[in-house]
């Protein structure tokens, strides 16, 4: 090809296009003379382009080289303004003490390599210098042009290498004539190479030839998603492939060791990203990391590193499209910048292998359900506290607060308000310390923890003196309720403890939820109590009588009738069995709400059999038309009733009757008016009838068991109402619950409907209403007020 005319090799261009695209030469890198450490070339031929890689891992014989000049340079092939398109560029002289080189850019032309060189980076005043080139007026650039000089200030040449018109990390560093010779060959990894190039671009990477010619090549197809970083040190070259693609993350490349070389730079590879030093002051200034990464691929995390210098790295990502161009002219006219080719720079911190860059964070195992008490270090402290706790029945004045209801939690909110108004319950929970999640990540008592937290949501108010209690209504109106809150930790107990109340489609019942709370608290306290006495067998039974064996029955029969604490039970084959009263395990919950009823069964020609049953709520049947008041329901409870259809083993029908009496009265008596009647068909109907209930309730002696009538005084069987839970609606489904509570600090009553709190008079509490019916009645013993 002639070199004296204004000829170009990649298509036909008009003079305007020539002046626009190819008028400015570019700075290039000069390599040392070929008679010392020079490059070895590998040419790869494909259908649409030729590819030549170069390195410095062999010494080229003088007679076999195609390079005839001692000073030469190889320039880029991608940038349309690069000087390889102009065939008449004069080579520049090499500076002897030059240590940094800009780029390795080469072209392949028929039959020999065209060696072009511009001025060095230091020669800013020359026509080929980058400084002069940057100061020129910006002209209209072709669509595919990549601006790689935007970050360079005036008069200063870039220090990074430029490959295909873009900043690249594979520049030559510290190559001089004083470099040592290689004692061994470093095999070049024949992986296609790609740089940060625009779409529809073709990459030509050449190497200096070795031995006969540049005809020895590896047939490797260029892939847009598989970049290869080529690096040259004083006496070696590393070609490290780093594979990136749309569907695969960066892979870790292995640097092959070499022997007999003396390098002054540290090299590192981490996940296909090559760390290279930028000059002699690498330890001081750091190392730059350049990689081509697809924007759609996952972010690669460094796993290995070889350099010992901590560095700040920059990662550039782009998504080149692998579409071969028909000609360079069509490439310049038709290529359009893609929106996916934007370069993003991410500042990352590189650390040496002594300290791992990825420290796996230890995940704390969070258990949804309660843990055993043996795994809870706080359990023993709570157990000791509950063992020595003394119930406080002193009335407490609390600032009222509503409860936010974002679901169907009205039956829970109504029950919670009644329990907060119960002084012994409030004082009990306030005596237990409240632990944070950091202090107690796993708990064996979720029910206790939740109610301790609930009671701490309410603050005390000063109790007005008796002189002002006469003006109770005025005092109440001067008190403002606190802010409403949502007790989500209480709602969560239904799923944590896996109660049947959490089953989908189950009837939401305030009385059933109250039993769920009280039984749950009792069981947790029983477990804590067992922690203090692990060898006590009685604690393994929550509540219930112990049945004696037949031998014990015979011994008891020989001793006589027995004491008042004994009870009889009909065992198998209708044989009478005598059993002592069970030793019930007491907890603070049973000390507040727990009572006992005595159920006696009468049968002809047989001894009476009695059973003691504990209760938290006393169930009152109000279905009969004769029952109009709570007193009527209590008398109906203890009335003797006959049991029909009972037959013996001889198929003879026997008349049996049963009677229930109150054996023990609790400090807090909860009466359940059974308004829901379940039919044989499976349906449920609500009994809409008014049941009168007094503020002060006296349990008559006729309701008590014969053995305790003389032991319980009048003050111990007289109760005062302090809370009422109402059920709204005429059906069992789609119901709503509200609560009226007595506030001692206000000396009056409050009506709480979820988050709404208002003051009412006492007659409104006991007055019958068509829109609501009393469902649960909370009474306190007057001797404990």
Curated annotation (Swiss-Prot):
Please state the gene responsible for encoding this protein. Answer: USP10
Described by its record, this protein's role is as follows:
Hydrolase that can remove conjugated ubiquitin from target proteins such as p53/TP53, RPS2/us5, RPS3/us3, RPS10/eS10, BECN1, SNX3 and CFTR. Acts as an essential regulator of p53/TP53 stability: in unstressed cells, specifically deubiquitinates p53/TP53 in the cytoplasm, leading to counteracts MDM2 action and stabilize p53/TP53. Following DNA damage, translocates to the nucleus and deubiquitinates p53/TP53, leading to regulate the p53/TP53-dependent DNA damage response. Component of a regulatory loop that controls autophagy and p53/TP53 levels.
Swiss-Prot/TrEMBL keywords: Autophagy, Cytoplasm, DNA damage, DNA repair, Hydrolase, Nucleus, Protease, Thiol protease, Ubl conjugation pathway
Q: Where is the composition biased (Polar residues)?
A: 113-122, 262-277
- Compositional bias, Basic and acidic residues, is annotated for 290-304
Q: What is this protein called?
A: Ubiquitin carboxyl-terminal hydrolase 10
Against PROSITE patterns, the record matches this protein to: USP_1, USP_3
Q: What is the top EC class of this enzyme, as a single word? A: hydrolase
Species name: Gallus gallus (Chicken)
Question: Where is the protein found, in the record's own terms?
Answer: Cytoplasm; Nucleus
Print the organism lineage: Eukaryota, Metazoa, Chordata, Craniata, Vertebrata
Q: Where is this region: Disordered?
A: 113-145, 262-314, 537-581
Task: Spell out the reaction equation it catalyses.
Answer: Thiol-dependent hydrolysis of ester, thioester, amide, peptide and isopeptide bonds formed by the C-terminal Gly of ubiquitin (a 76-residue protein attached to proteins as an intracellular targeting signal)
- Name the protein family: Belongs to the peptidase C19 family. USP10 subfamily.
Which GO terms fall under biological process for this protein? autophagy; cellular response to interleukin-1; DNA damage response; DNA damage response, signal transduction by p53 class mediator; DNA repair; negative regulation of canonical NF-kappaB signal transduction; negative regulation of stress granule assembly; protein deubiquitination
- EC number(s) reported in the record: 3.4.19.12
Low complexity biased stretches: 305-314
Which Pfam families did the record assign?
PAM2, UCH
Compositional bias segments (type: Acidic residues) = 552-568
- Cite the GO molecular-function annotations of the record: cysteine-type deubiquitinase activity; cysteine-type endopeptidase activity; p53 binding; transmembrane transporter binding
- The USP domain is annotated at 401-782
The residues annotated as the active site are 410, 736
